[in-house]
């Protein structure tokens, strides 16, 4: 069984394995930079370790592959019979990270 981990980043929990590419909320790091995730909730594999709330001394190391924005989401509000309307778009920024190592 391959080793995996569950990390907390950007207010979400993400299951990761070595070599996997994940999309997370924007991290302030340039492409090619190495990032370390310290909030490891669970490390699984041959022996599963569950944190309370995090696993002590466990880290997940990854490399930032790119920064980008998701597809545009358009919101449109209007008031009937009043001629009032509002159109707004939003593109959420993200960071693509490739997982290099899980240190438990």
Curated annotation (Swiss-Prot):
Keyword terms of this UniProt record: Ribonucleoprotein, Ribosomal protein, RNA-binding, rRNA-binding
GO biological process annotation, one example: translation
InterPro entries recorded: bL21-like, bL21-like_sf, Ribosomal_bL21, Ribosomal_bL21_CS
Residues making up the signal peptide according to the UniProt record: none
Entry GO CC: cytoplasm; ribonucleoprotein complex; ribosome
Keyword Ribonucleoprotein set for record: yes
Superkingdom of origin organism: Bacteria
Coiled-coil intervals, chain numbering: none
Chain ranges passing through the membrane: none
UniProt GO MF annotations: rRNA binding; structural constituent of ribosome
Subunit field text: Part of the 50S ribosomal subunit. Contacts protein L20.
Function, as annotated: This protein binds to 23S rRNA in the presence of protein L20.
Protein family membership: Belongs to the bacterial ribosomal protein bL21 family.
Descriptive protein name: Large ribosomal subunit protein bL21
Organism for this UniProt entry: Streptococcus pyogenes serotype M1
Phylogenetic lineage: Bacteria, Bacillati, Bacillota, Bacilli, Lactobacillales
Gene this chain is encoded by: rplU
């Amino acid at each position: 069984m391959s080793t995996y981990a569950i990390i907390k980043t950007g207010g979400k929990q993400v299951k990761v394995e070595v070599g996997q590419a994940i999309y997370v909320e924007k991290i302030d790091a340039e492409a090619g930079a190495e990032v370390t995730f310290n909030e490891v909730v669970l490390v699984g594999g041959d022996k599963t370790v569950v944190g309370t709330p995090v696993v002590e001394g466990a880290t997940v190391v990854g490399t930032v592959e790119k920064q980008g924005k998701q597809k545009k989401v358009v919101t449109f509000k209007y008031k009937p019979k009043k001629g009032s309307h509002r159109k707004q778009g939003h593109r959420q920024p993200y960071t693509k990270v490739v997982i290099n190592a899980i240190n438990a």
